[in-house]
Design a protein with these regions (language model features):
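Exported/periplasmic ABC-transporter solute-binding proteins
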Residues: 1-156
Length: 156
């Protein structure tokens, strides 16, 4: 399974232009506040801001989602005008509208994998779970939970 970085806004507000790197840069500069998550997607957003050369202008507007708080909370309450997080976390969140994935030329895909620790107390049960998740029969359940089978949030 994999998930890309996506963009969301509070439900019902106009969706910003994120169709290109330059459009995203402009959107970041004009946003009043910017939410980003912890982990790889948040690190990637910070690196993009640095790459765009707008760190000094953006830093005062950045709001990192605290551990245990979801991005939709910041967006729905207006603490963040625009938010960045794994698409799998944004796609079904209440109170927000998913805008879309980052442009492909600046996208970062996070791949999720499963393994069985060598010191597992129940290696056979773990192997059965991993096998079940990898089986084609699991796809409908995974799609329901993740909403989209494609890491960029598109229907395959």
């Amino acid at each position: 399974m994999a998930s890309a970085v996506g963009v969301a806004v509070r439900a019902g507000v106009p969706k910003p232009d994120i169709g290109s790197s330059e459009a995203l840069r402009t959107t970041l500069l004009t946003a009043k506040s910017i939410g980003y998550s912890t982990g790889p997607s948040g690190d990637h957003v910070v690196s993009l801001i640095e790459r765009f050369g707008i760190t000094d202008q953006i830093r005062p507007k950045l709001k990192q989602v605290p551990t245990g708080v979801r991005m939709e909370t910041l967006l729905a309450t207006g603490e963040a005008e625009i938010g960045f997080q794994q698409i799998s976390e944004l796609i079904r969140a209440p109170g927000i509208d998913y805008v879309g994935p980052l442009p492909s030329e600046i996208q970062k895909i996070t791949v999720y994998s499963a393994g069985i620790p060598s010191n597992s107390k129940q290696p056979e049960a773990a192997k059965a779970l991993v096998s079940a998740l990898a089986a084609g029969d699991a796809a409908p359940v995974i799609i329901t939970v993740w909403s989209r089978p494609d890491p960029l949030g598109r229907w395959a």
